[in-house]
C-alpha cells in the first residue's frame, strides 16, 4: 500500500492511497481459500470447487467486501501511522467510472482512493496558574427560606366550598367557552377549570370580572388578548368568554407546621426548612458555577489562539444558527427587530462557533493530559437523568443511545468538560466574594455590551461560552396553554 500526501495547507490534508492490483488479488485469494470448504455449489463436492470457479462466482462480491473493509479501517490506521487526529470523519472518494470500478473488482487495476480531512491542531498547554476568578457567594437569609416555604404552603393549601360571592383569594371552578367575533377558537374551551382569583394565571381582565360571582351563576365577560400574545390569531383581539360558575371555595388558613411537612412526605417542618434551604443553595450555586466557568473560559480564550478546523466550526455554527432562527421564529421577530442584520448576526455567531470549537479542543487536551476520566457510573447517572426528563419514552431513548453512533459521546462530553473545569479550578486562584441575590443574578457586563444588540435568544446561543447556559429567557406571560387559551402556560 502506498500513501501519497497531495495536500497540506494549514489544517487541511488530502492523501492518495494506492493498493496494487496484485495485493488486492492476494487478499481475494486468501478470502476465497477461507470460504472454499464452506460453500456449496451444485456439481462439486464440498471443498473441491476449483479456485477459478470460486473466483468467477464469488470474486466480485468478495472484492467488494474487501474494498468496503479497507475504506472503513484504513483511514484510522493511516492517520495513526502519521501521528494525526482527524477533526471529523475523513471524506473518502473513489472512482466513479464504472469500467474502472469493474477492473478493480476483478483485480485488474490498482485500488485507489483519496482521504480528505482536517487535523486537530497540536496544542501546547500553557501555565494556567495566572488565571484568577471570582466566585460570587450569596448568604441565604432566613426570610428567603421562609418566603419559599410560604409559597409551597400556598400551593398545598386546601379550599372549602362556601356560599356567597367570590373574592380575591377564593378558588372558583368554572366551565368556559371563548369566542372571537362570535366564533369559538381552538384552546378556548375547558370544563371544571380551577382558578384562584388574583393569581394572574389568566389573561388580563379575566379574573377581575369573576370577583363577586356565586356558584350557579352564568356570565359572559369580554377581554382583550395582549398584543404580544404568542398565538398570532388571538394577539390583540377582543374575545368573549361564556362562563358557568360551578363552585366557589375559600382558602383554608396557611399553617407551616409538622402537619404540612407530613402532607409533603416529610417528617417535620424542620426537615422541610432544611430541604428548601438546600434547594435555594443549589439554585444559587448553579448560577455561581456558570459565572465562574465563564470567567475561566474567557481567560482560556485569551491564552489560546490557533487555527480551528473549519468543518468543526461549520457544524457548530449550523447548530447555533438553527437555534437562533428557531428562537426568532417563535418570538415572531426578525433580525431587524433586534437592531442587526442577518449578515452581521452570521459574523457574530461564526465567531462564537470558533470560540466554542477552540475552547472545546483546549479543554479536551487539558483533560487528556490531566488524566481526566468519566466513569461508567457517571455515564449511567447521566443516562438515567435523560430518562427521568422524558417519562414514557425510556425505550426510545435507550435504543437511541444504543444504536446511534456518537450518542454516548454526547452524554460523556458535558461530564468530561465539567470535570476538566473542576481540575482547572483546583489550580487557578479562586477568590470568594459575598454578594446579594440581585448582584449574583445580574448579567455579566460583557454580555450587556455587545457590538450591536444581539439577535433574539443571544443567551441561548452563548451557552457554550460557559459550557452551561445562563438562565433561560423568561417565558412569555399569558402564553396559551395547549388546552386553555385563556390560561397562562407558565403556571
From Swiss-Prot:
Comp. bias intervals (Basic residues): 452-461
EC number: 5.2.1.8
Domain annotation PPIase FKBP-type: ranges: 169-254
Key word Cell cycle present: yes
Superkingdom in the source lineage: Bacteria
UniProt GO molecular function: peptidyl-prolyl cis-trans isomerase activity; protein folding chaperone; ribosome binding
GO CC terms of this entry: cytoplasm
GO biological-process terms attached to the record: 'de novo' cotranslational protein folding; cell division; chaperone-mediated protein folding; protein transport; protein unfolding
Localization (cell): Cytoplasm
Reaction(s) catalysed by this chain's protein: [protein]-peptidylproline (omega=180) = [protein]-peptidylproline (omega=0)
Disordered, as annotated region: 433-491
Record key words, sorted: Cell cycle, Cell division, Chaperone, Cytoplasm, Isomerase, Rotamase
Gene3D superfamilies, per the entry: 3.10.50.40, Trigger factor ribosome-binding domain (3.30.70.1050), Trigger factor, C-terminal domain (1.10.3120.10)
The keyword Chaperone belongs to this UniProt entry's keyword annotation: yes
Domain writeup: Consists of 3 domains; the N-terminus binds the ribosome, the middle domain has PPIase activity, while the C-terminus has intrinsic chaperone activity on its own.
Family designation: Belongs to the FKBP-type PPIase family. Tig subfamily.
NCBIfam families: tig
Function: Involved in protein export. Acts as a chaperone by maintaining the newly synthesized protein in an open conformation. Functions as a peptidyl-prolyl cis-trans isomerase.
HAMAP family referenced in this protein's UniProt entry, alphabetically: Trigger_factor_Tig
Protein name in the entry: Trigger factor
Amino acid at each position: 500500500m502506498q500513501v501519497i500526501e497531495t495536500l497540506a495547507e494549514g489544517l487541511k490534508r488530502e492523501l492518495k492511497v494506492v493498493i496494487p492490483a496484485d495485493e488486492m488479488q492476494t487478499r481475494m485469494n486468501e478470502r476465497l481459500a477461507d470460504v472454499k470448504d464452506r460453500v456449496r455449489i451444485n456439481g462439486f463436492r464440498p471443498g473441491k470447487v476449483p479456485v477459478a470457479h470460486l473466483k468467477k462466482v464469488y470474486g466480485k462480491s468478495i472484492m467488494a467486501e474487501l474494498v468496503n473493509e479497507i475504506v472503513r479501517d484504513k483511514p484510522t490506521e493511516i492517520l495513526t501511522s502519521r501521528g494525526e487526529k482527524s477533526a471529523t470523519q475523513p471524506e473518502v472518494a473513489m472512482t466513479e467510472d464504472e469500467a474502472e470500478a469493474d477492473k478493480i473488482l476483478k483485480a485488474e487495476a490498482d485500488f485507489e482512493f483519496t482521504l480528505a480531512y482536517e487535523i486537530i491542531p497540536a496544542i501546547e498547554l500553557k501555565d494556567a496558574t495566572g488565571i484568577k476568578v471570582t466566585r460570587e457567594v450569596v448568604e441565604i437569609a432566613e426570610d428567603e427560606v421562609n418566603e419559599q416555604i410560604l409559597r409551597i404552603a400556598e400551593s398545598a393549601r386546601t379550599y372549602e366550598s362556601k356560599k356567597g360571592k367570590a373574592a380575591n383569594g377564593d378558588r372558583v371552578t368554572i366551565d368556559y367557552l371563548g369566542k372571537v367575533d362570535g366564533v369559538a377558537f381552538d384552546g378556548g374551551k375547558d370544563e371544571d377549570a380551577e382558578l384562584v382569583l388574583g393569581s394572574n394565571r389568566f389573561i388580563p381582565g379575566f379574573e377581575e370580572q369573576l370577583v363577586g360571582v356565586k356558584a350557579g351563576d352564568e356570565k359572559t365577560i369580554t377581554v382583550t388578548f395582549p398584543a404580544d400574545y404568542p398565538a398570532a390569531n388571538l394577539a390583540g383581539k377582543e374575545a368573549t368568554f361564556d362562563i358557568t360558575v360551578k363552585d366557589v371555595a375559600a382558602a383554608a388558613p396557611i399553617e407551616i407546621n409538622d402537619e404540612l411537612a407530613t402532607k409533603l412526605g416529610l417528617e417535620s417542618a424542620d426537615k422541610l426548612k432544611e430541604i428548601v434551604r438546600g434547594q435555594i443553595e443549589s439554585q444559587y450555586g448553579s448560577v455561581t458555577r456558570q459565572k465562574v466557568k465563564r470567567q475561566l473560559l474567557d481567560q482560556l480564550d485569551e491564552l489560546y489562539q490557533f487555527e480551528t478546523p473549519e468543518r468543526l466550526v461549520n457544524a457548530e455554527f449550523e447548530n447555533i444558527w438553527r437555534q437562533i432562527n428557531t428562537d426568532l421564529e417563535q418570538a415572531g421577530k426578525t433580525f431587524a427587530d433586534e437592531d442587526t442584520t442577518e449578515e452581521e448576526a452570521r459574523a457574530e455567531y461564526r465567531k462564537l462557533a470558533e470560540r466554542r470549537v477552540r475552547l472545546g479542543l483546549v479543554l479536551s487536551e487539558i483533560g487528556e493530559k490531566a488524566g481526566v476520566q468519566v466513569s461508567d457510573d457517571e455515564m449511567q447517572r447521566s443516562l438515567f437523568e435523560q430518562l427521568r426528563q422524558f417519562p414514557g419514552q425510556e425505550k426510545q431513548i435507550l435504543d437511541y443511545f444504543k444504536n446511534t453512533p456518537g450518542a454516548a459521546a454526547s452524554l460523556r462530553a458535558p461530564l468530561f468538560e465539567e470535570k476538566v473545569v473542576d481540575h482547572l479550578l483546583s489550580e487557578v486562584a479562586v477568590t470568594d466574594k459575598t454578594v446579594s441575590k440581585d448582584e449574583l443574578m445580574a448579567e455579566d457586563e460583557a454580555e450587556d455590551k455587545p457590538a450591536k444588540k444581539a439577535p433574539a435568544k443571544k443567551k441561548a446561543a452563548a451557552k457554550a461560552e460557559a459550557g452551561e447556559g445562563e438562565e433561560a429567557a423568561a417565558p412569555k406571560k399569558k402564553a396559551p396553554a395547549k388546552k386553555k387559551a385563556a390560561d397562562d402556560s407558565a403556571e
